[in-house]
A protein has these predicted regions:
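Short alpha-helical segments in extracytoplasmic peptidoglycan/chitin-binding modules
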Residues: 476, 482-488, 493-497
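Conserved structured catalytic cores and adjacent interaction surfaces
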Residues: 376, 480, 485, 502
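Extracellular LysM carbohydrate-binding repeats and other cell-envelope/extracellular binding modules
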Residues: 492-519
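Surface-exposed, interaction-prone regions with an acidic/low-complexity signature
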Residues: 453-477, 510-519
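Membrane-lipid interaction segments
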Residues: 2-468
Length: 519
């Protein structure tokens, strides 16, 4: 077998491959004994468990990660209108087995609380049982040698132009910000911190040689119990904005790349200083994940044959990321919360959380449907000053239209967050809440098809020639592919087009076609 006269040009194309798409569960169990300086438990207002991923790594075919689960219980004591809060942080280490190796793996870990039950054993003891699910998605880069051109041995090529990620770079960084915050002079001193929350507002992502510069604001919210100057138990909210700017080293990156940067809060601890100065120390942990791509175009060989010899071709199915479309949309969800314990005198705080967010393709609507649930919560007091906690779930759906004239498969990677939550009292016992959801993330278009990774001409198997004829007549139907006709008769598509004075490689109408033979 001799292929010396056949010369091949190749290009290394990179394709994104999913290494892991799985979930695991972690049980959360805590037998909680109150410290001596905490008041007795009369009624639990709310028990929440909040999981956050602290770090992750891949080593020896395993994905390992550390997770912190914060247990926070709000309760009141008998004949006392103060809202008390106890909390405990529990740490876990989990791992997944990975199937196969890929370059530049990108890790997305999404923890969520499945359920939590809090049972009051006695006035000093709580039995807490719950579960957390962590969904892991790991993608990596696989490079495949693809034939882009060939010469000699009467080779005929069918080509297609493709857009592909010439380079794909990933990076992850853990950022810790420690800042001193100051209460407003009009605010009462902090008693007990009842709730903290953090929302990231990205401002700018800039790529320079070997570095990614990311800037933004961390909007921090705090709810705390306090006492008014009249000696009345109450609660106050306070908001702070922490600007941040970080430089992340990424070898090979420059301003020709496009980047998907996602910043996730992994912890927000606020500790009041003991000198009654109104100064608070805030420790904020952020996880930054970045996927950067540089797209390029080339022509690849999708089919081949020789007019002189039999051929062998090795083929592979391709899925090439050809376009990334940034998502920027919003959606509003409303709910009513009714109080069964009398009239609502005041609301200290309202907020909303997202859960069970999924996406699916609706081919009839030609859109992706993002669905999930919003849990609305309020903390306030009834007419006699007793603290109350109300919550309600509202499902939602949002459509993301697919762009017109999309050629290839399309997928979506949404990134949702609650941008704002507002309320008003509809009547004495009902509050109406509205949550504004910001929808970010990316839509990825993949070109799919068959590519040739190896091509051989079998020079010891020449094709039969009939020197008696220079032309054959072929009767064709409308839309027949001239490439397939040329391949069948072992001639060149160029010769057929010239002989029949055609400009298109599809037959426009039924009729007769002259086939020049390669003798």
């Amino acid at each position: 077998m001799n292929t010396m006269d056949l010369k091949l040009n190749r290009e290394m194309l990179s394709m994104t491959r999913t290494i892991l798409d799985a979930s695991c569960e972690q049980a959360v169990e805590k037998d909680f004994l109150l410290p001596d300086y905490y008041p007795d438990i009369f009624r639990v207002l709310k028990c929440v468990i909040t999981p956050t991923v602290q770090s992750h790594s891949i080593n020896g075919g395993k994905l390992s990660f550390d997770m912190a689960v914060l247990i926070r219980v709000l309760y009141i004591s008998q004949n006392d209108k103060r809202i008390n809060c106890i909390e405990q942080k529990m740490n876990y280490t989990k791992s997944f087995d990975l199937q196969g190796d890929c370059g530049d793996p990108m890790i997305w870990l999404t923890p969520k609380c499945d359920y939590v039950n809090c049972r009051v054993v006695n006035q000093r003891r709580l039995d807490i049982r719950g579960a957390v699910t962590i969904h892991a998605n790991v993608t990596g880069e696989v490079t495949v040698p693809i034939v882009t051109d060939a010469f000699g041995c009467g080779i005929q090529l069918k080509k297609a132009a493709v857009t592909y990620p010439a380079k794909r770079l990933t990076a992850a960084k853990r950022i810790t910000l420690i800042e001193e915050l100051q209460l407003s002079a009009a605010k009462a001193p902090v008693g007990t911190i009842l709730r903290t929350d953090c929302r990231i507002i990205p401002q700018e992502h800039k790529m320079i040689a070997g570095k990614l510069v990311t800037k933004g604001d961390a909007e921090i919210m705090m709810l705390y119990s306090c006492v008014t100057t009249d000696g009345e138990e109450t609660a106050e909210t306070m908001r702070f904005t922490l600007p941040f700017s970080q430089i992340i080293d990424i070898d090979g990156i420059d301003d020709t790349f496009t980047a998907d940067v996602r910043i996730t809060p992994a912890g927000c601890d606020i500790i009041p200083k003991s000198d009654d100065s109104g100064t608070l120390e805030c420790e904020l942990v952020l996880l930054v994940n970045c996927v950067a791509k540089k797209l390029s175009t080339c022509e690849i060989v999708t089919d081949a044959y020789s007019t002189c010899f039999e051929c062998e071709a090795e083929r592979c199915e391709s899925k090439l990321d050809s376009e990334n479309i940034k998502l920027s949309d919003s959606h509003s969800v409303t709910a009513k919360l009714s109080c069964q314990e009398g009239e609502i005198r005041c609301i200290h705080d309202s907020w909303a959380t997202l859960s069970n967010v999924t996406s699916r393709l609706d081919e009839e609507k030609k859109a992706f449907i993002i669905s999930g649930s919003v849990t609305f919560c309020i903390i306030g007091r009834n007419e006699d000053g007793t603290p109350l906690y109300l919550e309600n779930d509202s499902p939602f759906e949002h459509e993301i239209p697919i762009p017109e004239n999309v050629n290839g498969e399309i997928s979506i990677s949404p990134d949702l967050c609650i941008e704002n939550c507002t309320y008003y009292l509809a009547d004495e016992t009902t509050a109406e809440l509205k949550a504004d959801i910001k929808i970010g993330g990316e839509m990825t278009i993949q070109q799919t098809g068959t590519m040739i990774s190896e091509l051989r001409v079998l020079t010891d198997k020449p094709k039969e020639k009939n020197g008696k004829y220079a032309l054959k007549i072929c009767y064709c139907n409308e839309s027949d592919d001239i490439w397939e006709i040329a391949k069948k008769y072992s001639t060149s598509i160029t010769a057929i087009l010239e002989e029949n004075e055609l400009t298109d490689d599809k037959i426009s109408k039924q009729g007769m076609l002259l086939i020049p033979l390669m003798n």
